[in-house]
């Protein structure tokens, strides 16, 4: 299992738009075989940083998800919403592996 941890820098005047965008991604990740661990939106402290994470069984499974997502109307619409809405100023992705005891 691999987990992608995302760190977003947002336009703080467009947090509601980002929240809507995030709510749309969660079922898409699940639809295509991933586990979405949720989004964390600004509350106290920095008002422009959000986090999210999701997992897939392997990097190959994630790549298959990406290909299927590009062919999915809801996936394409969400990508377009982010482009036109400009609520995400930057995004960092870090891939992590779980340590089990």
Residue ranges and their predicted role:
Residues 45-48:
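Short acidic/glycine-enriched loop/turn segments that link adjacent beta-strands
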């Amino acid at each position: 299992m691999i987990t992608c941890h995302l760190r977003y820098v947002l336009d703080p005047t467009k947090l509601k738009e980002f929240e809507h965008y995030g709510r749309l991604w969660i079922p898409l990740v699940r639809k295509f075989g991933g586990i979405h661990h949720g989004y964390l939106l600004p509350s106290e402290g920095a008002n422009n940083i959000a986090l999210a994470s999701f997992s897939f069984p392997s990097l190959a499974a994630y790549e298959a998800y990406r290909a299927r997502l590009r062919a999915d109307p809801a996936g394409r619409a969400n990508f377009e919403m982010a482009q036109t809405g400009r609520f995400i100023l930057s995004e960092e992705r870090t891939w992590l592996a779980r340590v089990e005891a």
